[in-house]
Amino acid sequence: MMPEKRLSLVIATYNRGAKLCTTLDSLLVQTLPQEQWEVVVVNNNSTDDTAARFADYVVAHPQLDARMVLETEQGVSAARNRGIAESRGEYIVVIDDDERVVPEFLERYYSLFESHPEVGAAGGRILPGFESVPPRWMSKYTERTIAGTLDLGDRMREFPEGKFFGGGNHGYRRAVVGRYGGYDTSLGRTGGVLLA
């Protein structure tokens, strides 16, 4: 029998093996003890070397409890739903395959859900990072829209009605996902549609 994990980190990926490995690098220094969390990477039918890169990565970093599952239905919503279905944690945290997280990232989600049983879902800041200078078309408005940056500050508060979490950096209790059925696959990022 597999040991129980309290928190599952779900990462959907499609043809971004190099970026995924950079994301995984940021998980190696998490302050939450490794026995409390797992990583479920969902390969959304990649056609490049993403699966091979991931396999090499987990061999090189056996301390990371990470596995990859395949989702052939294209779209981030279908991929995230598969990751949730394959996960074991009571708390489910979602990030994108190009995000880097701070060392306290998972510990903060874990502590929030453990100490506030009334909280069913939570989200946090996403600060864009660029490999070079930001593209010229990137304004503060497009940065907020594309990166999902909605900064409500450092203290916990109820999420404003009519607002929604950005692409990555949000988490749920498994019971909440079960109650509402996961992500709507008719909205996922496929082709020209940008909602998940």
Task: Name each model feature, range by range.
Residues 104-138:
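Conserved donor NDP-sugar-binding/catalytic core segment of glycosyltransferases
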Residues 92:
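Short aromatic/hydrophobic "clamp" motif used to bind/position activated sugar donors
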Residues 18-21, 48-57, 104:
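Acidic helix N-cap motif at the loop->helix transition within catalytic regions
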Residues 26, 43-52, 99:
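A conserved acidic beta->alpha catalytic loop
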Residues 1-29:
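N-proximal low-complexity "stem/linker" segments adjacent to membrane-targeting elements
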Residues 142-162:
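Short, flexible, basic/aromatic active-site loop/helix in glycosyltransferases
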Residues 15, 27, 44-45, 74:
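Conserved short acidic donor-positioning loop in nucleotide-sugar-dependent glycosyltransferases
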Residues 71-87:
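Glycine-rich, basic loop-to-helix element that forms the pyrophosphate-binding segment
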